[in-house]
């Protein structure tokens, strides 16, 4: 039995009232008794300070300086010390019987802050005979002693043999030593742990149920599952590292793409410029040769152009002299044509206007008659409308008067007045003063007859008016015709003049008939004259071109000679044309073939490059497509074998991973179902109980238990019998062992140990022989050893798998390269070299071009002679038909004679044309000019007077008719008849009024209609008169203008004038055309000469410059080639397919690559500077330097441990394969690292169940504790509802939330926090991050709620709160909980410390007088049962039956304050035994 460590004594040195006092501590209860201020709290403060020397925690509330402003800094410690060095030391003896003295040196720090300096220390190996006071004091004499400083104490202890002194700079180290030596129950690693320990001591010191303790019971009682947390942290760290590695791989892949892009663009940039310079060098050589050939050709052309210029200048001078006379003749002919055209247009206008005037004259006469008729009709309509208006007004007046009279019974008087009024009006109009109603009817007949007579007379005058008007218009028309022909004349002379004009018109018409024959004759003669002049001009021109004068008789012989020459030259030209066509056709065929080959050459070169790459990659040479396909089949077989081997290694690696994963399960359970069953049965796995077995014992225990090594240990087998019924989800063999998991041993079997084997006697008739396994996995150490060996094996397998994966991917990429080659290049890769064929065809093309140039020169001379002969024949063909015209000399005189006769005939034709129509109209009406009708005006006046008379007669007849109608109004018989008559009269008046109003409406409508019609007729008449007058004036003006022109306008004059003008224009145009041709040719010749001269100068300059450039470029090109060959990059740069691109295409390719390179090297200062220098077009070697720098830059970044090549291109290919393999491997590793949510829930549930069982065991120790009415105390541990829901979801519904746990963006902790928020949206998470919340959720303690309950009196179990308990009950309950906490700490620390140490247990209790005797006795009993030490402070002696009691009395002696201490050991029947060291009072003395 391991003895528990004990505190032996407490020593106070130089404290307030205690100079050198040692309190021996009882093994159970030490009581400090005394009044107020006796020093009880100081003694306990010294103990606590030595136990927890942390000034941030120490705070002694029972201080004499309460309320002081510096109290917050003092914390109650400064006032308990004396000036100088102070000590507080604890003398302990642990379970190993080692004496350890731990303590602190305290010293007040001068200043206003009242600070205290604390230095912890420890002393080991001190003999039991040495007292603590002897160590730190030095006796000066009988009455004086001195306190040693810490340095002096160290020196003193160094002199003692076997004594170790340790001074600590950190409280953590101090507490670590105390924990290791069994002085404190818990390892205090941090300030948080020290705070918990201090709160525990403080809670016990002041008694009661501490709220700080009860609120944090989980932290005090439940141990931190650091292993699980660390496992999760390691898992997340591994996942994070894995993801960072994947991200780094992605970055590396991006860098690989960047490097690949850099190589590609750098190659395009430099190779395009390299090939462009190579092409330009070849082009410059060709240009230099072309310049030299063109220079010689241009000199020949210049000499020929100079000869040609002299001939054209002479001919141009002759044409300039002839152009002046032709221009004058052409201008005269143009003017004459314009006059003739003007006269013809004038004549046409005159004829058109005369026809218009005749038509207007007829329309004007007709319109006059229409207007006259319309005016008469208008007068009648006006009279009818006035009469209708008067009648309506009269009837309305009568009807109105009648209505008024009818209303006042005076109708008769009104009607009589109306009749009188009508009678008076009739008298006035008819001039009949004696008119009566009786005679009105007779007068009505008379006036109606008068109206009829006036109407008849008006009609008679209207007929006479019409006849007179017709005669008058005929005379006027004839008179106007005579005046138009002869001009103004008297009306009396019109007859004579008209007859003379008719006789003259007959003669003029006869002459006019001869115009057309004369004109045709003249036109014929003029045409012959012009042909004669043209023949003379052609003859002169022909003689000029031939260079000699020819007679007319010699022309036919010359024509035959030229035709013979043309025939001979034509054969030569045609044969030359065929020969030239054949040469050109062959040249075109060659050019087409070369173009076809040039188009095929890049494809062939690309195929060759691809074939060379394949040959380099596989180390084989291919000469035919069959060899390529055969090698591809070999690749497929090799790839299949590698894949099979890789899959075998991968399967073994996966098996190792699965075994590692199985062995890494917590508790050593190889089957997850065992954990669930253990939780279900309330048991513990046997492997978990033996988890701490050593590696040496693992084979023995593995053989001992054999197949039952995975059994479940349950407290009672009988209680789970029912649960075994229907159990299916379990291993095939499930072993159950009955036993206490807390104190399980291997006594369940009878076993005999043999050599490397055991014999287990399971029953009397059943034994089991088991050998020790060579690879035991029973116990954590064995599993870790096995896991370590498996990890080593896995590393070897991983390396082999990586190598095989690399080989497989390399083979696959090679297979893909062969497949691409077969699909893209196989058809052309093994064809003949097109470049060699191009060189051969180019040589033949040069020969053809030379032959064509020679042929063209010879053919040009023959063609020139042929053209000259054809031109001479053409001129003679135009001359020979006109030889008879050249001999006719009287042609010009005949033309002049016919011209005079034509002029006379044209003058007569113009007279007939001008006045022929007027004469034809005058001839039938000339007889009306003999008499002039002057009585027309008198007839018009008579007609108007008759019209007025008819209107007056009509009005008189209407007035008399009204009187006759009103005759009934003049007499009435009586009033009744009058009323009856009135009614009839009223009706008649209304009917007449309606008829009169209708008649008035019709009259008004007719009046308006006829008025509009009359207005329209009048307007038309005015328009016709105006148009007639205007056209008459225009006709007179046109006739005067025609006379002013002075040209006879006949039908053939315009044609002759136009023909003459056109002939002159043709001659002038031909002359000008020839002159322009000569001028242009001369200008062109001069320009050509100037261009040739300038071209010669330029060619000479270009030729010399090109020669210099070729020579200079040759030197630069040699330097470039030397640099390319020295650096071994010619294969990369000399890309033959680029030779077929133009300079612009290559420059564009280089510029595009340059733009991409600027972006690619923007972050690399060295490459950026080299690239900037390489942009100089005059220094092509700098581009080579840049390309070399890029390759060197990439070579430096090749990891030679992974990639074994110096070529960056090959390195990139290998890097791509390696990165792909790493990505695949890391992705699978991430999937294996990720823990399932079900596993997390099981781990947390299992931990919670284990801790609940542990708390249940701790509760058993509290069942017998009672204080006052408190019969028992217990702890309740419950799982929070929200967290229980989380566990359920994690274990059973995890599929619904895979979006969280499968996310690569979230760690497991963050996913867990997101799930918790999703399940509990009502909970505010504050400002905490998901990672922090997730880490809290991985701690099982946050899932539990703990509370203290007491069984008090009749109330039963209640929640332990200070308000529900008495002071003594609260103190006892709190002490019980603190004891439980200490015991829990010890259990937790047992795994961290040696099992041979049982730590000290000590608690405090201040003001213990508040407890009754029973409670004190219970405390004593609790301390005895739990082997716990207790220090109690009380004002009065509490009379303990056991333990040690110190009586403290503070006294003043000689102005010096000190505490008098008396110690007693228990109260027994015998006298109390005086404890050693307490017989004399403690007399303080000043330190020297």
UniProtKB/Swiss-Prot annotation:
Homodimerization via its hinge domain. Binds to DNA via its C-terminal region. Interacts, and probably forms a ternary complex, with MukE and MukF via its C-terminal region. The complex formation is stimulated by calcium or magnesium. Interacts with tubulin-related protein FtsZ. It comes from the Bacteria. Residues 666-783 are annotated as: Flexible hinge. Residues 326-418, 444-472, 509-602, 835-923, 977-1116, 1209-1265 form a coiled coil. The hinge domain, which separates the large intramolecular coiled coil regions, allows the homodimerization, forming a V-shaped homodimer. This is Chromosome partition protein MukB. The keyword Transferase does not apply. It comes from Salmonella schwarzengrund (strain CVM19633).
